[in-house]
């Protein structure tokens, strides 16, 4: 009799273990993605709001300008591809918009904090306000049309969607231009506070599944290396003080996410270490097939100071910016943004969970368990 009880207990344990494995191995089937950020994930907002992001941007994949500051796809594009969802339509784009499977509120030049120093007026707080308005209007129209308007997200998608945030680079890069390392570090708590307010507002609106990208190694951006030639470098050639600030920002961000996991019931947070993935591109550039980690592909018509995609008239002649032919051999597209090849390498690390905490693939980001 004792043997049969032991056997039964083992069977029960095995069944429970099998069920847990099955749950973890299955995909989350996120029906939508709502993204917030800056030009690293802007799929056309700044183009719709201020002016077109001109060619040769987009040439590698889209064959045309597609509102992205890159030669092709961004990290967010690879994420939606992996989730078998369409590319995200910018919230600010009203022509041919389809929000069935989410929307993109990221806008180039945006900061976390509201500041006039940022290129874009659409700081993170504004992006969240836009989302709240978007959700309210969507629910209203959905009810008015009895769910027949198929270009809008389904009413239950908002609680089942994946919410991705990739923003903070501009807060640090702009601040570095007129602050010392220690002065800039002193602003981080306020930046994190603004970020936290945004997350809590999204949670209040029903968001439950969050993928939080930390900031990359801003001190490795070629345009900043050119702007600050006298600043001390790290062993790989990046601006050491600015990367120190980025590391401190990421440390405080991760601590805050750990805290929010406890504060917000039923929330599922994935902290993604984008910094390590992007810094790895720099430190292992040659092995990954890149020529020079600090060179960039899209250059101005009169040198590297004009800007990618811009044109000027010089002595009555219109001059165009151009891009290199060997785009896959470059990390940086224009001195600020990444090439599609670099974006893909970083995205692969995000999607397989190797730089995430907890270390689960993006497709399984809803399977996290509370500790």
From Swiss-Prot:
InterPro entries: GDSL (IPR001087), SGNH_hydro_sf (IPR036514), SGNH_plant_lipase-like (IPR035669). Keywords: Glycoprotein, Hydrolase, Lipid degradation, Lipid metabolism, Secreted, Signal. SUPFAM superfamilies: SGNH hydrolase. It is an enzyme of class 3 (hydrolase). GO terms for cellular component: extracellular region. Its EC number is 3.1.1.-. Gene3D superfamilies: SGNH hydrolase. One of its GO terms (biological process) is lipid catabolic process. It comes from the Eukaryota. Residues 1-23 form the signal peptide. Glycans are attached at residues 82, 143, 178, 194, 315. GO terms for molecular function: hydrolase activity, acting on ester bonds. The keyword Nucleotidyltransferase does not apply. It is found in: Secreted. Transmembrane segments: none annotated. The active site is at residues 39, 334, 337. Belongs to the 'GDSL' lipolytic enzyme family. PANTHER family: GDSL-LIKE LIPASE_ACYLHYDROLASE, ZINC FINGER FYVE DOMAIN CONTAINING PROTEIN. This is GDSL esterase/lipase At3g27950.
């Amino acid at each position: 009799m004792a043997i049969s009880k032991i056997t039964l207990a083992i069977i029960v344990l095995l069944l429970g273990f099998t069920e847990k494995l099955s749950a973890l191995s299955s995909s989350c089937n996120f029906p939508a993605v709502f993204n917030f950020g800056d030009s690293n994930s802007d799929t056309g907002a700044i183009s719709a709001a201020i002016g077109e992001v001109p060619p040769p941007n987009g040439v590698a994949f889209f064959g045309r300008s597609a509102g992205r500051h890159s030669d092709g796809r961004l990290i967010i594009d690879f994420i939606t591809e992996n989730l078998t969802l369409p590319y995200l339509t910018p919230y600010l784009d009203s022509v041919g918009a389809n929000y069935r499977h989410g929307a993109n509120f990221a806008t180039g030049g945006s900061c976390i904090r509201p500041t006039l120093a940022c290129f874009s007026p659409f700081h993170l707080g504004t992006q969240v306000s836009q989302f709240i308005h978007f959700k309210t209007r969507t629910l209203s129209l959905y009810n008015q049309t009895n769910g027949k308007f198929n270009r809008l997200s389904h009413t239950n998608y908002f609680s089942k969607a994946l919410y991705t945030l990739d923003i903070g680079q501009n807060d640090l890069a702009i601040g570095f231009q007129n602050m010392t390392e220690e002065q800039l570090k002193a602003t981080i708590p306020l930046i994190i506070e603004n970020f936290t307010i945004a997350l809590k507002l999204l949670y209040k609106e029903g968001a439950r599944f969050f993928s939080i990208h930390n900031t990359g190694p801003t001190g490795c951006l070629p345009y900043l290396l050119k702007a600050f030639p006298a600043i001390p470098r790290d062993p790989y050639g990046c601006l050491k003080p600015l990367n120190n600030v980025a590391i401190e920002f990421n440390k405080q961000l991760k601590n805050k996410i750990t805290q929010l996991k406890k504060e917000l019931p039923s929330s599922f947070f994935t902290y993604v270490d984008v910094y390590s993935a992007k810094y790895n591109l720099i430190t292992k550039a040659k092995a990954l097939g890149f020529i020079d980690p600090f060179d960039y592909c899209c250059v101005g018509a009169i040198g590297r100071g004009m800007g990618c995609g811009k044109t000027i008239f010089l002595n009555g002649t219109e001059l165009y910016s151009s891009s290199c032919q060997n785009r896959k051999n470059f990390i940086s597209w224009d001195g600020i943004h990444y090439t599609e090849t670099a974006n893909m390498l970083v995205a692969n690390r995000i999607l397989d969970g190797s730089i995430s905490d907890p270390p689960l693939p993006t497709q399984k980001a809803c399977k996290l368990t509370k500790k």
